């Protein structure tokens, strides 16, 4: 380091370093302009297409470019002047001259009519030959060696003309004269080809060409005088050559090298901004001395790449907070190798452990390689006990959809992934890595708790004497388009929710330190150096315990990241220290160590309010209407809604509280307003569950979107808005009604619904919902809404409303067979389901007034969108048995621990099975509703069968109108699809129902019914329970025996069983009638013809008597 820099850094060593420079000053200084990821450059503009005219196509055919506009304008003026001159000459002549001219013209035309075609052919031949030879012989001086072609017509014809005039012997014998004249022509042409050094093959071509065109002139121009033939041939041939050379001279031939640009054309380049080249941390374009004194940095191409912006940020932060340690960097002092080797040894010990996940092992190997690279380089010596700060305002959680072959949201394993491991040490003697498994989404539904999404410098700080913090190299992730659109919609709407929810109660604490993992993605660090909206407030301080050092971040405001387009957070430290005591675990060596750590200070209230007001004005600028709506409570906006939503709320919610919701009666009652049934039911359910207040959903935007959504459903027999409303009602019923025997994890519904909506964002709380129209009778009942967070249930309800959006009334197989655009777009996989999800989200992102989720923060919206898409894709019946097998393995397998409500994967699986059951709930309704839904699906099937027959395709099963098989369709559907799904869902204890007292003989009757229906799983369990109870009573006799045991009555299973029984009876009757008809036909076929006729007559007489 230079002397002046050391002198400038001396005051910083005596006092705490100043706060980071403001972003405005940073952006104004010249050196800071190099800290972003882009550079200015210039590129040549794209060449505009030439005009598409007849002349353009002619030039393209001739392999030349058309002339410029100025040349074309000059040519037009010349032709106009020539036409005017000819017209004036004709008008100036008298009638006598006109008659003589007409006679001469007729004579000329009659003479030329026979010779015009040969002359034109000769001209074209010379034109194309000249074009070919000009292109073949083009050199650096373009066209300079091609003008000899103008003498080619003269050699072909003028020599023949001179011989005809001077040598009389050529006029004798025609054959001998023709041969002599041809030899003369070929001799002249051969001498001509020797002058410009023509290639041999080109010379031979010219000789053959000369002989051919001479023969055409000799044989085709018989109508002209002999002396005139060579002259006209030479004239038209010269014209063709001259035209070809002129085109080559004045116009640029395509494919030729462009002429050298003059100095003035350099200014025609367009200025652009392009991204810098991504390279490793040691190849940043600047010398190592500019960053780390005079130390030399060796490039290691095998290491992962760190962006230029990240390296600049790290170095800038070091210069601000670690300046006292730069004083010895000029002397070549680097990192303390003993500390680095100790850290490498610890990593090596961790790698020996075979129980570590593969992700952790790969990350530890990367860290070991990094430390090996650092040990061979000379760097400034950094205090080992000073936290190395890293900034992650735009951290992105891993999306399980993008994990390729990994199966995160399905399956029995829910192990967390470690995209980037950070060196952590325990204070114990073993020194092993302590990793905690966090499986709960803290309200926002992030992949990790928000302690793990906070700044990595507040992570695990080593308590040993050789502690040090190392840089991590996270994997760069691409930004999500959906989140970018969501952030864009927020700018047009109200201000988002001010903070994220952090739940410290769900984060286990290890013995030595809290386990933190680095987030997956880095923000473009130029945002921190150039933008005033991303300001870090820091001060140095010392704390005596590790608990005081642990602070997480809350989002006090939001802005947009310039590198990925996501909504980023402005960090303000407002969290409390963790309650776990860490200093009791310290060893004797650690007691003598004093840590100097960084802490984030709380920003003054006045400054924070000012920044919030500025951001609010930025988001709501130019949209006063949306700003007023966002500031008004939802209750004030009800005046904008349909009155039916408010007036008939009680009666509607009372009807919907029944599983057999008479939705078709509601459609008939609404009449003309039946097109709004989905939005009205959706609004009623959100009011009932309190989701509007919980997530601060603006009512007007909510109604705007769902009215537009229901308008997107087509008027088809089954997959219409009424079906979507029925599925929505089913998922609401299954998640809010009492379930016998379900254990509730959260019972404080009343407190949560009555509390202020901002309280849901405070630490340690997760929002749950409960239905206002339903109460839990006693502790023997539970509810799914008590075990699934409100955000996930809201995603389930929205997915139910979206799940068949823009359904065409055809199956996936039909779209694939007909090569529909959707099938091609989605590669024949879950075509309709992908189309429903994509179209519904595209509708949401299309207009700002549809953004009813504007108060969800970045992580909540990402989680919400993921859940909605997964729920919609789960409705694909092609994947039905995969989901069913996975659900049985999780919930009903003997070796399984059952559903873990703390696992987000298990909760997602339950929601997927729930919406699948709601989507095919028709057979589980009462008989009348079931028949109405059956009529709709059959009519839709018949329409597809008719179209298949029209297209010449094989008609799909059960879709042939000419051979209806309604009973077989429903019986097969219940037996193979609906029945197993309902049985598995019931066996898992998730179906709503009620406890009833079982009477004597119930078991026997239920056993008989189950034998008929092939559904005896429940009663087998009941028999096992009864056997266990009898054994227990025998071993421990009690003074009083209960008279009977309670059973669960489920309305859904009851209707399913009854409908299945009825369809089976119908099938048996049809088969019986069919067998009797076949038997009658066989008997009739065995009788004589007369007897057969007599039987038919008798039957007719009997029928006539019956009708009489």
From Swiss-Prot:
- The annotated regions of Pro residues compositional bias extend over 14-23
- Residue positions where Phosphoserine is found in the record: 15, 279-280, 427
Q: How does it sit in the membrane?
A: Multi-pass membrane protein
Keyword Membrane in record: yes
Q: Which GO terms describe its cellular component?
A: endoplasmic reticulum; Golgi apparatus; guanyl-nucleotide exchange factor complex; membrane
Query: Please, which domain of life does this record's source organism belong to?
Result: Eukaryota
Q: Top enzyme class of this protein?
A: hydrolase
Indicate which residues the UniProt annotation says bind AMP.
719, 804, 919, 970
Ranges of Basic and acidic residues composition bias in the record: 1-11, 435-445
State the post-translational modifications. Phosphorylation at Ser-279 mediates insulin-induced activation of PDE3B.
Activity regulation, free text = Inhibited by cGMP.
Q: Which Gene Ontology terms describe the biological processes this protein takes part in?
A: angiogenesis; cAMP-mediated signaling; cellular response to insulin stimulus; endocrine pancreas development; glucose homeostasis; negative regulation of angiogenesis; negative regulation of cAMP/PKA signal transduction; negative regulation of cell adhesion
Disordered: annotated span: 1-32, 405-448, 999-1042
Q: Where is the PDEase domain?
A: 633-1070
Region (Interaction with RAPGEF3) residue spans: 1-32
- What are the boundaries of the region Interaction with PIK3R6? 421-445
As annotated in Swiss-Prot or TrEMBL, what is the tissue specificity of this protein?
A: Abundant in adipose tissues.
Which residue positions are annotated as catalytic? 719 (proton donor)
Can the keyword Cytoplasm be found in this entry's annotation?
no
Protein name per the record:
cGMP-inhibited 3',5'-cyclic phosphodiesterase 3B
């Amino acid at each position: 380091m230079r002397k002046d820099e050391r002198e400038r850094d001396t005051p910083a060593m005596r006092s705490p370093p100043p706060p980071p420079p403001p972003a405005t000053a940073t952006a104004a200084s010249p050196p800071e302009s190099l800290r972003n990821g882009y550079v200015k450059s210039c590129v040549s503009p794209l060449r505009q297409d030439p005009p598409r005219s007849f002349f353009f196509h002619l030039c393209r055919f001739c392999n030349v470019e058309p002339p410029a506009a100025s040349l074309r304008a000059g040519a037009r003026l010349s032709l106009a002047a020539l036409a005017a001159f000819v017209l004036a000459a004709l008008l100036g002549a008298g009638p006598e001259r006109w008659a003589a001219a007409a006679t001469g013209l007729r004579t000329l035309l009659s003479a030329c009519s026979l010779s015009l075609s040969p002359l034109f052919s000769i001209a074209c031949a010379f034109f194309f030959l000249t074009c070919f030879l000009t292109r073949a012989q083009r050199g650096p001086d373009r066209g300079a060696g091609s003008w000899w072609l103008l003498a080619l017509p003269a050699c072909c014809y003028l020599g023949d003309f001179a011989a005809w005039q001077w040598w009389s012997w050529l006029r004798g014998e025609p054959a001998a004269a023709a041969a002599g004249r041809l030899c003369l022509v070929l001799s002249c042409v051969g001498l001509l080809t020797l002058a410009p050094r023509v290639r041999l093959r080109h010379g031979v071509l010219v000789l053959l060409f000369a002989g051919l065109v001479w023969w055409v002139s000799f044989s085709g121009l018989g109508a002209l005088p002999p002396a005139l033939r060579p002259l006209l041939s030479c004239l038209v041939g010269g014209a063709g050559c001259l035209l070809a050379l002129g085109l080559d001279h004045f116009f640029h031939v395509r494919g030729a090298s462009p002429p050298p640009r003059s100095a003035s054309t350099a200014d025609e380049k367009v200025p652009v901004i392009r991204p810098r080249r991504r390279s490793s941390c040691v190849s940043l374009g600047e010398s190592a001395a500019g960053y780390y004194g005079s130390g030399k940095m060796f490039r290691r191409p095998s290491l992962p790449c760190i962006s230029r912006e990240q390296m600049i940020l790290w170095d800038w932060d070091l210069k601000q907070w670690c300046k006292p340690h730069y004083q010895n960097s000029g002397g070549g002092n680097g990192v303390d190798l003993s500390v680095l080797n100790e850290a490498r040894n610890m990593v090596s010990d961790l790698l020996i452990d075979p129980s570590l996940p593969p992700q952790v092992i790969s990350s530890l190997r990367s860290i070991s390689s990094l430390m090996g690279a650092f040990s061979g380089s000379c760097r400034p010596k950094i205090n080992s006990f000073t936290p190395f700060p890293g900034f992650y305002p735009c951290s992105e959680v891993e999306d399980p959809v993008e994990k390729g072959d990994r199966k995160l949201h399905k399956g029995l394993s829910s192990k967390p992934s470690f995209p980037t491991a950070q060196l952590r040490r325990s204070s114990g003697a073993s020194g092993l890595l302590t990793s905690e498994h966090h499986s709960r989404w803290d309200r926002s539904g992030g992949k990790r708790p928000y302690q793990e999404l906070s700044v990595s410098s507040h992570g695990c700080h080593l308590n040993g004497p050789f502690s040090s913090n190392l840089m991590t190299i996270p994997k760069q992730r691409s930004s999500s388009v959906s989140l970018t659109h969501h952030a864009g919609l927020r700018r047009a709407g109200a201000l988002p929710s001010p903070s994220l929810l952090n739940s410290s109660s769900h984060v286990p604490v290890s013995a030595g330190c809290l386990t933190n993992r680095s987030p997956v993605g880095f923000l473009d660090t130029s945002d921190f150096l150039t933008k005033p909206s991303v300001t870090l407030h820091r001060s140095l301080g010392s704390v005596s315990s590790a608990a005081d050092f642990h602070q997480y971040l809350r989002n006090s405001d939001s802005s947009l990241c310039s590198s990925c387009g996501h909504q980023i957070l402005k960090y303000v430290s407002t969290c409390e220290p963790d309650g776990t005591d860490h200093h009791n675990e310290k060893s004797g060596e650690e007691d003598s160590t004093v840590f100097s750590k960084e802490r984030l200070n709380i920003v003054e209230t006045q400054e924070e309010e000012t920044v919030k007001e500025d951001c609010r004005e930025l988001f709501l600028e130019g949209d006063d209407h949306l700003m007023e709506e966002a500031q008004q409570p939802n209750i004030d906006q009800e005046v904008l809604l349909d009155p039916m939503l408010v007036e008939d709320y009680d009666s509607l919610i009372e009807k919907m509280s029944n599983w057999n919701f008479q939705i078709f009666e509601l459609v008939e009652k609404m009449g003309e307003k039946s097109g709004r049934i989905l939005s009205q039911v959706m609004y009623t359910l959100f009011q009932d569950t309190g989701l509007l207040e919980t997530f601060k959903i603006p009512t007007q935007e909510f109604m705007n979107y769902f009215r537009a959504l229901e308008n997107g459903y087509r008027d088809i027999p089954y997959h219409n808005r009424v079906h979507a409303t029925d599925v929505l009602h089913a998922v609401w019923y299954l998640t809010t009604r009492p379930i016998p025997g379900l254990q509730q994890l959260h019972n404080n519904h009343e407190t949560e619904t009555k509390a202020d909506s901002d309280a849901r964002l405070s630490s340690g709380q997760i929002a749950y919902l409960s239905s206002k129209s339903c109460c839990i009778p006693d502790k023997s009942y539970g509810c799914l809404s008590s075990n699934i967070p409100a955000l996930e249930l809201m995603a389930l309800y929205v997915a139910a409303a979206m799940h068949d959006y823009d359904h065409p009334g055809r199956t996936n197989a039909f779209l694939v067979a007909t090569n529909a655009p959707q099938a091609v777009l989605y590669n024949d996989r879950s075509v309709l389901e992908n189309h429903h999800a994509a179209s519904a989200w595209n509708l949401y992102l299309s207009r700002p007034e549809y953004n009813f989720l504007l108060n969800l923060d970045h992580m909540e919206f990402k989680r919400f969108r993921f859940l909605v898409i997964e729920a919609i894709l789960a409705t694909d019946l092609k994947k039905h048995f995969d989901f069913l097998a996975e659900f049985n393995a999780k919930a009903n397998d003997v070796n399984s621990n059952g559903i873990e409500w703390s696992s987000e994967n298990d909760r997602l699986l339950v929601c997927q099975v729930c919406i699948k059951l709601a989507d095919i709930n028709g057979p589980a309704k009462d008989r009348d509703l079931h028949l109405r839904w059956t009529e709709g699906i059959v009519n839709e099937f018949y329409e597809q069968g008719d179209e298949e027959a029209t297209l010449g395709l094989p008609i799909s099963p059960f879709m042939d109108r000419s051979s209806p098989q309604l009973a077989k369709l429903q019986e097969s559907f219940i037996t193979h699809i609906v029945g197993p799904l309902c049985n598995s869902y019931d066996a898992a204890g998730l179906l709503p129902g009620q406890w009833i007292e079982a009477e004597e003989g119930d078991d026997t009757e239920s056993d008989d019914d189950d034998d008929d229906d092939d559904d005896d799983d429940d009663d087998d369990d009941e028999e096992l329970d009864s056997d266990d109870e009898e054994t227990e009573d025998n071993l421990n006799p009690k003074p009083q025996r209960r008279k009977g045991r309670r059973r669960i009555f489920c309305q859904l299973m009851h209707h399913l069983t009854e409908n299945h029984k009825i369809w089976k009876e119908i099938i048996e009757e049809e088969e019986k009638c069919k067998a009797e008809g076949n038997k009658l036909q066989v008997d009739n076929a065995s009788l004589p013809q007369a007897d057969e006729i007599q039987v038919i007559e008798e039957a007719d007489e009997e029928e006539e008597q019956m009708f009489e």
